[in-house]
Amino acid sequence: MSGILIYTKAEAERNQFAVHKFLQNLDIKLVDETYMGNADFVINRTNDYKIAQYFEEQGIRVFNPSELSRLANDKQKCYEFMMEHNIEIMPINYTGIPVVKKKIDGHGGTEVMMLNHTEAFEDNYVYQKPCDTPGKDLRVWLIGRKIITAILRESKTDFRSNFCLGGSAIPYQLNDNEICLIKKIAGLVESDYIGIDFIFNNGRLVFNEIEDTVGARMVYDKTDIDIIGLYCDYIKSELEL
């Protein structure tokens, strides 16, 4: 079986290490988001659920599923989904100040702002109550709904703790309650390889977002886990290769 690995050209350039790991471990070729040819399986590393949907409609196995990508890339829908399933989030449609303003489909913390004034709600943004512990969050990596590792990210200079924005990162030992919460969230959505991000409020984890094209830089920098290798092993197992 031969598959395709889909990245936009810009993201393929930015993620050369990950691309190399995929190509090294699987019989696949790298293509961009315009590819509409044949494949036995697809690894979708774009944030566009329609790409996954296109191949799914042809009966082709896609990692991750389109419905997961659709949910992960619409923060408003994702928060509403979590609330429906009794997963704690920070309140949305928040009218107080300060307020966190997030682009619905934003990534990497680059379109997240802390406002100290009120404004009319803009389309394509989520307005959310800030947590009581800014500049600190937790990312958990899962493969096939199994927890692989967790890393705590902190920033002393910014309410955003993203590693790519200069925050620090250290491995984190999950407690039993945290593991239970993560497993509950993982059980709500079909997924293959994701990150789940949490913020801290009142001393406990609060759901923040799902990353369907989760990066691996922190895992390789801070642990000895070959997470892309593990993901490739999972793909082989799923395809019975």
Task: Give residue ranges: language-model regions.
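Hydrophobic residue at the +6 position relative to the catalytic HRD Asp in the kinase catalytic loop
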Residues: 196-198
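PAS/PAS-like sensory domains
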Residues: 191-194
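Glycine/Thr-rich phosphate-binding loops of Rossmann-like dinucleotide-binding domains
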Residues: 51-52, 109, 204
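Generic C-terminal helix-cap and adjacent flexible tail
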Residues: 236-241
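Conserved N-proximal alpha/beta basic substrate-recognition cap immediately N-terminal to
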Residues: 6-91
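Short glycine-rich anion-binding loops that position phosphate/pyrophosphate groups of nucleotides
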Residues: 47-49, 104-106, 213
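Active-site nucleotide/adenylate-binding loops and adjacent lid/helix of ATP-dependent enzymes
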Residues: 4-5, 56-59, 63-138, 144, ...
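ATP-dependent carboxylate/phosphate-activation module, predominantly the ATP-grasp catalytic core
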Residues: 116-117, 121-189, 200, 205-207, ...
